[in-house]
Swiss-Prot record:
It comes from Methanocorpusculum labreanum (strain ATCC 43576 / DSM 4855 / Z). Part of the 30S ribosomal subunit. Contacts protein S5. The interaction surface between S4 and S5 is involved in control of translational fidelity. One of its GO terms (biological process) is ribosomal small subunit biogenesis. This is Small ribosomal subunit protein uS4. Residues 108-180 form the S4 RNA-binding domain. The lineage of its organism: Archaea, Methanobacteriati, Methanobacteriota, Stenosarchaea group, Methanomicrobia. Belongs to the universal ribosomal protein uS4 family. Pfam families: S4. NCBIfam families: PRK04051.1, uS4_arch.
Length: 181
């Protein structure tokens, strides 16, 4: 069974360590999304892998036993979770889950959304603002750049009230606003 306090690995490293095409594509993702290391990409890949395997499992259950209540409940749970995070549209099917990409997962990270909303000048600065406690979601300080933001929480992302960036006259905030304009 194992010791319950032991942390388990949240990602799986690539089978081929020095595959040139994979390294180049990961480098582009790391630069685009301001990631600290490749492990963050592998973690997002693992999240995607879990959702896709769940979708394949539901499709297999549907083809073998039909539309049983257990199958319907599992499908609704899986689709509902992905819709809540904005990875699927409101009229999505199981096939849409299989077509998701790593970029879709990375787009829902707090770091990316802070940059896309114009609260930071770059993805790296967005990461710094989050880790230093300048960003809040619905008034609650969040200091995890990899936090998956749901659709409901997205509108509540702003500077933390008591942060130095919470003041409109802050010099760095003025530079961020000028760059956005």
């Amino acid at each position: 069974m194992g010791y319950p306090g032991k942390n388990t690995k949240q990602y799986s490293s690539p089978k081929r360590r020095f595959e040139k095409s994979r390294i180049e594509s990961e480098r582009v993702l790391a630069i685009t999304y301001g990631l600290r290391n490749k492990r963050e990409i592998w973690r997002a890949t693992e999240v995607l892998r879990k959702h896709r395997s769940g979708a394949r499992e539901v499709l297999a259950m549907t083809s073998s036993i039909g539309e049983a209540p257990k199958t319907i409940a599992r499908r609704d749970e899986l689709v509902g979770t992905l819709q809540r995070y904005g990875l699927l549209g409101p009229d999505a099917a199981m096939d849409n889950i299989l077509s998701l990409k790593v970029e879709d997962i990375l787009e829902r990270r707090l770091q990316t959304i802070v940059y896309r909303k114009g609260l930071a000048r770059s993805p790296k600065q967005a990461r710094q603002l989050i880790t230093h406690g300048h960003i809040a979601i619905n008034g609650q300080r969040v200091s995890v750049p990899s936090y998956m933001v749901s659709i409901a929480e997205e509108a509540g992302i702003m500077y933390y009230a008591t942060s130095s960036l919470g003041d409109e006259a802050n010099g760095e905030r003025q530079r961020i606003m000028n760059q956005r304009a």
